[in-house]
């Protein structure tokens, strides 16, 4: 295993020093592959393109992120930015590597969340685009473009994580494989417009299930805060250690999104607009308005206390599906003052 980890450091060093002109590209790619962006950008964009697709993206995202959290608790993967010091590798071998603001994530490293969650959530997007392309083109070369773009983007995300010293190559590979498999398995099985109790119980199961596993492992003598301690110890700058990278931050986001999805699907606003077919201009207006509300939510910031941070994060991601699915389309449709035509499947 030591040789595998050492090879990962060598690969990261090569990416940082032999391709210095690509630094900004890797930083941008890792930003695009951040699971948080799936909730904030990909989910609204997919929903306003297709109602079914948007709900699929949100559902798969929070289920995949929850599973990634559980996998990390059991696999105990080191991250390169702390392993290189803890193992003594940096004192035994002369290396030239440096950290970035995105390097200092506090959770365990295996498997890569960026690769696993993004790979799972973008699978229905890729298949939906592939179906559209296949219906309009007979060229086999054109038909493979969506799948090729999906693979290329995930490969770039994986390389960016190695470049940033956030993951070892084998953690990236594991995330890619598990993410694609999850996307393939879950896409046909996403629940659509179930009763509110179903989503409430899902949120409760995510919260209680992870908490039960955490306290069981803690009772058995396993310190699950070990990765937080190492990240704080070896990160070059304290301000690079962000609270939203902590394991329970993702748990509050996932359970909040599950509950918010159920609430959104049972609001009076959603009941009024679900029979409406929004035009392209209205869909663009919905996305722009949703992004404006997102900017406002981000502007509010987070409380510094960790417990209040988790509560605020839960409430924020409970509210977000309600805004995207119900309130924003209702406002746009009402202001446009158009008569809703019959239901169109999407």
Swiss-Prot record:
Pfam families: PAP2 (PF01569). It comes from the Eukaryota. It is a multi-pass membrane protein. It catalyses: D-glucose 6-phosphate + H2O = D-glucose + phosphate. Substrate binds at residues 79, 161. Its EC number is 3.1.3.9. Inhibited by vanadate. Optimum temperature is 37 degrees Celsius. Optimum pH is 6.5. Residues 1-24, 78-108, 160-167, 219-254, 305-307 are lumenal. The keyword Transferase does not apply. The active site is at 114 (proton donor), 167 (nucleophile). GO terms for molecular function: glucose-6-phosphatase activity. One of its GO terms (cellular component) is endoplasmic reticulum membrane. Widely expressed. Highly expressed in heart and testis and to a lower extent in spleen, stomach, small intestine, skeletal muscle and uterus. Expressed in muscle, brain, thymus, lung, kidney, spleen and pancreas (at protein level). In the brain, expressed in astrocytes (at protein level). The chain crosses the membrane at residues 25-45, 57-77, 109-129, 139-159, 168-186, 198-218, 255-273, 284-304, 308-328. The keyword Magnesium does not apply. Disruption phenotype: Mice display reduced glucose-6-phosphate hydrolytic activity in the brain. No phenotypic difference was noted at birth but 4 months old female mice display growth retardation. Mutant mice exhibit a decreased plasma cholesterol concentration and an increased plasma glucagon concentration but no difference in blood glucose concentration. Mice display neutropenia and neutrophil dysfunctions. It is found in: Endoplasmic reticulum membrane. Hydrolyzes glucose-6-phosphate to glucose in the endoplasmic reticulum. May form with the glucose-6-phosphate transporter (SLC37A4/G6PT) a ubiquitously expressed complex responsible for glucose production through glycogenolysis and gluconeogenesis. Probably required for normal neutrophil function. This is Glucose-6-phosphatase 3. It comes from Mus musculus (Mouse).
């Amino acid at each position: 295993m030591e040789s595998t980890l050492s090879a990962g450091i060598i690969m990261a060093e090569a990416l940082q020093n032999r391709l210095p002109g690509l630094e900004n590209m890797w930083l941008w790619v890792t930003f695009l592959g951040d699971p948080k962006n799936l909730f904030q950008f990909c989910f609204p964009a997919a929903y306003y393109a297709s109602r079914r697709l948007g709900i699929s993206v949100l559902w798969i995202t929070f289920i995949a992120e929850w599973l990634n959290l559980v996998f990390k608790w059991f696999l105990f993967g080191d991250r390169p930015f702390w392993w290189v010091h803890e193992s003594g590798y940096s004192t035994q071998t002369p290396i030239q590597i440096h950290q970035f603001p995105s390097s200092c994530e506090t959770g365990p490293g295996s498997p890569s969340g960026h690769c696993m969650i993004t790979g799972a959530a973008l699978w229905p997007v890729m298949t939906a685009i592939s179906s559209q392309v296949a219906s309009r083109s007979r060229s086999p070369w054109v038909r493979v473009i969506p799948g090729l773009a999906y693979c290329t983007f995930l490969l770039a995300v994986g390389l960016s994580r190695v470049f940033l010293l956030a993951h070892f190559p084998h953690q990236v590979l594991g995330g890619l494989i598990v993410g694609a498999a999850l996307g393939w398995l879950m896409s046909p099985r996403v629940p659509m417009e179930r009763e509110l109790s179903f989503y409430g119980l899902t949120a409760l199961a995510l919260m209680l299930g992870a908490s039960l596993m955490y306290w069981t492992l803690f009772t058995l003598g396993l310190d699950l805060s070990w990765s937080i301690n190492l990240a704080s110890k070896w990160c070059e700058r304290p301000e690079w250690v962000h609270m939203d990278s902590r394991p329970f931050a993702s748990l509050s986001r996932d359970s909040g999104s599950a509950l918010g999805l159920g609430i959104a699907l049972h609001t009076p606003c959603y009941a009024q607009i679900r029979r409406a077919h929004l035009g392209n201009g209205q869909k663009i207006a919905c996305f722009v308005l949703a992004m404006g509300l997102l900017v406002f939510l981000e502007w509010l910031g987070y409380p510094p206390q960790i417990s209040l941070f988790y509560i605020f994060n839960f409430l924020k991601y409970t509210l977000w599906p309600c805004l995207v699915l119900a309130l924003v389309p209702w406002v746009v449709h009402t202001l446009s003052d158009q008569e809703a035509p019959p239901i169109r499947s999407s």
